[in-house]
């Protein structure tokens, strides 16, 4: 009724021991470590069970991965030999805007990099993070400075046709004349403040407050009150 089975001891050794004898597995062949998978798998992305790719956008993958050769070497050489590929270290194989695909899609400065002559050096010099070039100061000749000083003595503000005529007579642009007059007015105001000194500035402030007091109290006075005197 019951099939005869071999007797088993209920010792720890008999319970832990395996019933089947240990079989040696086949040794790993060196050719099994060759990474010869097609590079198209990088472009298509890993297919999830739901059927959606983790990398749906092909722009996220560098174009160098398509040209990679399959890696085949012995297991003991993996830790000793450095992996250097010419596609990553050679400038002749590097795409100009491969690492900056968002630059061409930007509506503010994307039009500046359209064309075949775009390089990474151009991107660093004229890109969004490039420094603004300093404005070159105009070196005026002595005769030009003399004419400009005379025009400033007549009028501190030269605009319109007068500025255009002055610029043409001095072989300068209107922007250069405009900037010179702006700087000259700033220098003139600074010189006036230095000549007047702090005492004159304080007296002007005092007279201003006195005039406001007279207007508020409807009082008139022909003489000026010295606000700097102690009396």
Curated annotation (Swiss-Prot):
- Would you say which domain of life the source belongs to? Eukaryota
Question: Could you list the residue ranges forming a coiled coil in this record?
Answer: none
* InterPro entries on file: EMX-VAX-Noto_Homeobox_TFs, HD, HD_metazoa, Homeobox_CS, Homeodomain-like_sf, HTH_motif
Segments of the chain annotated as binding DNA: 133-192
A Gene Ontology biological process in which this protein takes part is:
pronephric distal tubule development
Q: Name the CDD domains on file.
A: homeodomain (cd00086)
Q: Which GO terms describe its cellular component?
A: nucleus
Compartment list: Nucleus
Q: Which SUPFAM superfamilies match?
A: Homeodomain-like (SSF46689)
| A Pfam family matched in the record | Homeodomain
> What Gene3D superfamilies does the database record attribute to this sequence?
Homeodomain-like
Ranges annotated as biased composition (Basic residues): 203-212
Q: Does the keyword Calcium apply?
A: no
The entry's keywords:
Developmental protein, DNA-binding, Homeobox, Nucleus
Question: A GO molecular function for this record?
Answer: RNA polymerase II cis-regulatory region sequence-specific DNA binding
Instruction: Name where it mostly resides.
Output: nucleus
Renumbered to this chain, region (Disordered) spans 193-231
Q: Which family does it belong to?
A: Belongs to the EMX homeobox family.
Function (record text): May function in combinations with OTX1/2 to specify cell fates in the developing central nervous system.
PANTHER family registered for this protein in UniProt: HOMEOBOX PROTEIN EMX-RELATED, HOMEOBOX PROTEIN EMX1
* Identification of the protein by name: Homeobox protein EMX1
What gene codes for this chain?
A: emx1
């Amino acid at each position: 009724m019951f099939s005869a089975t071999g007797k088993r001891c209920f010792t720890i050794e008999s319970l832990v021991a395996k019933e089947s004898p240990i079989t040696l597995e086949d040794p790993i062949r060196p050719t099994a470590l060759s990474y010869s998978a097609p590079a198209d798998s990088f472009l298509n992305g890993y297919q999830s069970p739901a059927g959606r790719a983790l990398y749906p956008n092909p722009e996220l993958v560098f174009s160098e991965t398509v040209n990679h050769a399959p890696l085949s070497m012995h297991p003991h050489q993996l830790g000793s030999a450095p992996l250097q590929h010419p596609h990553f270290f050679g400038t002749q194989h590097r795409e100009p805007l491969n690492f900056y695909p968002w630059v061409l899609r930007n509506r503010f400065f994307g039009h500046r990099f359209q064309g075949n002559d775009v390089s990474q050096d151009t991107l660093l010099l004229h890109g969004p993070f490039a420094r603004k070039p300093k404005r070159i100061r105009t070196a005026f000749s002595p005769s030009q400075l003399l004419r400009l000083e005379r025009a400033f003595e007549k009028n501190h503000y030269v605009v319109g046709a007068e500025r255009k005529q002055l610029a043409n007579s001095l072989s300068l642009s209107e922007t250069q004349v405009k900037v010179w007059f702006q700087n000259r007015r700033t220098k003139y105001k600074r010189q006036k403040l230095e000549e007047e000194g702090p005492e004159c500035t304080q007296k002007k402030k005092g007279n201003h407050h006195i005039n406001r007091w007279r207007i508020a109290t409807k009082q008139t006075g022909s003489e000026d009150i010295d606000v700097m005197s102690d009396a």
